[in-house]
């Protein structure tokens, strides 16, 4: 799919494979210049089709560093602790829309708790992995396609969007949230997106992605007629990102760089897990305390809904 043209929101301050856009409001009018996201969706699709050979790890971005299944499980457990309370008002008779369902980890969890679950993903290889995981669960429908255009019947009581908007140009992200506002008219919409602390960073070389700040997602939601009710940092992602950064650092050593990633990632994660209070807790905070944003990427959960839902929840 060819990316659409987009609303002029950001100023280009660097060029090359990674482009950084600060908040426009922080610049004077003479400094402002209009730019576009320029994400190529065909490249996004190619990346995920290739990554799906290790679908479970890939859906949690653990595949390139050879991180083990125990790392994926650690992250998923910490994520569930954030997300599940946001769906507490739903019942066993509720329906959930899972956009960007990947290998089906969240799809299975929702299907175990609710009457109807529809999962959507653009990667046939990811959906094949999801079908294997889900087996003969009869209350799940999986749809291959673009979440903007895929045929979706009925409305839902809640939606989960797992790392999808970061692969969409801004205008399309607004359009998707507008569609969700109609598909989930009264319930919670939960986003999980990799983020940066300020502004937007766009990578558009061999890997196309737009890392936005939570503040920018608030603006995108507002443009779609939705309210950001709550924002929570994804601690499970943060733990895994520490491992990712350390594996990347270790693999700069020639003898380690030539090895299978699993021979580096697996033992490193075990060491981090055994020393978690220091390596996953104190170390990142100590580095941030001296003014270094590390790990570079963050990840956030954002609870979205209508103004009426926000009022019902006391926000």
Residue ranges and their predicted role:
Residues 160:
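A conserved beta-strand element that flanks and buttresses the S-adenosyl-L-methionine
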Residues 163-167:
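Short catalytic micro-motifs in class I SAM-dependent methyltransferases
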Residues 155:
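Short acidic/histidine-rich motifs immediately flanking catalytic phosphotransfer sites
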Residues 179-184:
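Conserved helix-to-beta-strand junction in the class I
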Residues 99:
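Conserved beta-strand/loop positions that form the S-adenosyl-L-methionine
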Residues 3, 9-13, 20-94, 103-151, ...:
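Class I (Rossmann-like) S-adenosyl-L-methionine-dependent methyltransferase catalytic domain
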């Amino acid at each position: 799919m060819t990316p659409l043209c987009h609303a002029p929101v950001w100023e280009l301050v660097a060029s090359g494979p990674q482009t950084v856009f600060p908040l426009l409001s922080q610049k004077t009018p003479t400094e402002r210049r209009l730019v576009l996201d320029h994400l190529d969706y065909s490249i996004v699709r190619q990346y995920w089709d290739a990554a799906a050979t290790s679908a479970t790890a890939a859906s949690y971005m653990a595949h390139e560093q050879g991180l083990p299944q125990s790392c994926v499980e650690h992250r998923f457990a910490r994520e569930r602790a954030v997300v599940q309370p946001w769906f507490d008002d739903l019942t066993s008779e509720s329906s959930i829309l899972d956009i960007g369902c990947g290998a089906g980890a969240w799809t299975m969890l929702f299907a175990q708790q609710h009457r109807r679950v529809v999962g959507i993903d653009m990667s046939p290889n990811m959906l094949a992995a999801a079908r294997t995981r889900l087996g003969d669960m009869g209350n799940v429908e999986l749809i291959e396609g673009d979440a903007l255009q895929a045929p979706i019947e009925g409305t839902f009581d809640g939606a989960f969007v797992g790392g999808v908007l970061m692969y969409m140009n801004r205008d399309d992200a607004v359009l998707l949230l507008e569609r969700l506002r109609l598909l989930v008219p009264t319930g919670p919409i939960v986003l999980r997106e990799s983020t940066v602390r300020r502004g937007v960073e766009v990578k558009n070389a061999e890997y196309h992605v737009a890392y936005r700040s939570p503040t920018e997602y608030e603006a995108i939601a507002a443009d779609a007629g939705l309210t950001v009710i709550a924002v929570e940092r994804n601690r499970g992602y943060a733990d895994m990102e520490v491992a990712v950064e350390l594996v990347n650092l270790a693999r700069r050593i020639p003898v380690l760089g030539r090895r299978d990633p699993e021979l580096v990632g697996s033992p490193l994660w075990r060491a981090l897990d055994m020393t978690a209070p220091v390596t996953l807790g104190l170390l990142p905070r100590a580095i941030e305390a001296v003014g270094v944003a590390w790990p570079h990427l963050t990840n956030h959960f954002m609870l979205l809904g209508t103004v009426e839902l926000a009022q019902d929840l006391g926000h």
